[in-house]
């Protein structure tokens, strides 16, 4: 249980950092991974059960591979690193299983818990527009048109110089709004650095992952069972 609590603390801290600055400090996933392996060594010795240590190491390795694949897919380096940390920290945790995929993931030395946390987290992304809305409100964005009301849920308003640094795509300004910008919509030359424009949001995946981490011990793979029964 202590590993799970450490995971909660790490994810909450990562969520705050991601929400405020869209950056997650590396020390979080490193602490999760190091604590996970050290605690697994301690538990394996005191309980004379070395499968605990094997699970932690295999969880680290498998989640490292998955996290690297996430990075190559452009999903987010910070989110993938958190997965690596959780793989070492809580590779296994009690949760209900309803699907054949859940049964497969429940095999020995497969980190079924962090994988299921990330799967459920993807489904919880349906709530992300409300996270974006809340962040826009905190940043002082106030819609002046009907289009900007919609953008409060699906875009972010920021200064041009910040948008350029973060390589965002331009969605527009005032009534000149493009809800589906293409990759070439990054010509900031027509705006001043201090102007505020609407740009594409950076998806804070770690927030739905944190929510998933809290509820997955209760629901297991029930969402998969309801939406994609197999």
Swiss-Prot record:
Keyword Nuclease attached: no
UniProt organism field: Methanococcus maripaludis (strain DSM 14266 / JCM 13030 / NBRC 101832 / S2 / LL)
GO cellular component, one term: plasma membrane
Physiological role: Cleaves the N-terminal leader peptide from preflagellins.
Catalysed transformations (reactions): Cleaves the signal peptide of 3 to 12 amino acids from the N-terminal of preflagellin, usually at Arg-Gly-|- or Lys-Gly-|-, to release flagellin
InterPro entries reported for this sequence: Arch_preflagellin_pept, Preflagellin_Peptidase, Preflagellin_peptidase_C, Prepilin_IV_endopep_pep
UniProt topological domain (Extracellular) ranges: 19-23, 73-78, 140-204
Membrane topology of the entry: Multi-pass membrane protein
UniProt superkingdom: Archaea
UniProt EC number: 3.4.23.52
Family affiliation: Belongs to the peptidase A24 family. Archaeal preflagellin peptidase subfamily.
Keywords: Archaeal flagellum biogenesis, Cell membrane, Hydrolase, Membrane, Protease, Transmembrane, Transmembrane helix
Chief location bin: membrane
Marked site positions, Essential for catalysis: 18, 79
Any GO MF annotation of the entry: aspartic-type endopeptidase activity
Residues exposed to the Cytoplasmic side: 1, 47-49, 90-110, 217-230
Gene: flaK
Pfam families attached to this UniProt entry: Arc_PepC_II, Peptidase_A24
Entry's transmembrane regions: 2-18, 24-46, 50-72, 79-89, 111-139, 205-216
GO biological process entries: proteolysis
Protein name listed in UniProt: Preflagellin peptidase
Subcellular localization, as worded in the UniProt entry: Cell membrane
